Amino acid sequence: LLAWLSVRSAGGEMVLRIEDLDPDRCRAEYAAQLKEDLIWLGLDWDVEQTPQSLRTAAYHAAFAQLEEREMVYPCYCSRGELHAASAPHASDGQLIYPGTCRGLTAAQRAAQTRRPAWRLRVPEEEISFCDGLQGVYTERLDRDCGDFIIRRSDGVYAYQLAVVTDDGAGGVTQIVRGCDLLSST
């Protein structure tokens, strides 16, 4: 509702995007129900983007660009290993990735027996932006969350890679999210 009000009051274009990357949790009937509910509430949209589950080629191309620029690397850590390595956790319960696989050599990577997830190398500097509701938000990603996964070990692309790829392709300039997602914006 807030996204719709924000867009309509500014004369913008409302985009509906179905974020259905996770094949285990997302189903076509959920997306259909979501649309039906929005219509029932009187919330319309101007553009319906292709569902993320059908945009794998776009995410693969974005990932390949990051790989070409050496901005991603394979990570072989299990969740259990990460829980143990990052204790104590951040105050919000988020795991802070300690960089375990960031500097592995080619020989060390070749010796691994697990399929890797892929992490984005975050900059070692502070970033800031002005959120329309929360004001100026500043974070140091390397300290506050560490390098984050952009492709899971099963090959599914992460939300963070998908949404920026989709926003760029769709010319999206304003994003309305819950404050719980502010740190991943």
Walk through the language-model features, giving the residues of each.
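N-terminal Rossmann-like or analogous alpha/beta NTP/dinucleotide-binding catalytic cores
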Residues: 1-90, 179-180, 184
